[in-house]
Regions:
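Dynamic "connector" segments at or just before major functional cores
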Residues: 1-142
Length: 142
């Protein structure tokens, strides 16, 4: 009763995506590309921007909040229990692809940046409060 019915939608894929076998550039986390496409379709980045605050300014901002949250959440989805693998995942082709375009060449965040994000930035009162509408926003779009 009163439930919103969503029409089925089709995911589109990044045109830069290539499937090839090169031993030094293999990833076991390619399934996250589908999650990233879903995240884009649901508008996660916009929802994060609306509800989480970032006090960083200028050159201190190498990664957006959305990139940091994606890397943190996606690494857990891929089975990495903590931040110990962040340095290795920074160079992983999938973790580069799921971030914003500036990460594609540079690589994802390292352990120290993710640790700061999870223990300092994300735990600020305004962001703890903001996580509730982020969750509701994503669920509401699904």
């Amino acid at each position: 009763m009163g439930e919103k019915e969503n029409a089925p939608f089709q995911l589109t894929f990044n045109g830069f995506l290539k499937v090839a076998f090169q031993g030094s550039r293999i990833t076991s986390d390619a399934g996250l590309i589908l999650v990233r496409e879903l995240d884009e379709r649901l508008g996660l980045e916009q929802i994060i921007t609306e509800h989480l605050s970032d006090s960083r300014q200028g050159l201190n901002t190498q990664f957006t909040l959305a990139d940091l949250l994606r890397q943190s959440v996606y690494s857990r989805l891929a089975g990495y229990e903590d931040l110990n693998d962040a340095a290795r995942l920074s160079a992983d082709p999938t973790f580069r692809l799921i971030g914003s375009p500036k990460i594609w060449d540079r690589g994802a965040a390292l352990t120290s940046t993710l640790h700061w994000f999870e223990t300092e930035l994300l735990t600020r009162e305004e962001n703890l409060v903001g996580l509730m509408p982020v969750n509701r926003g994503v669920i509401g779009q699904a």
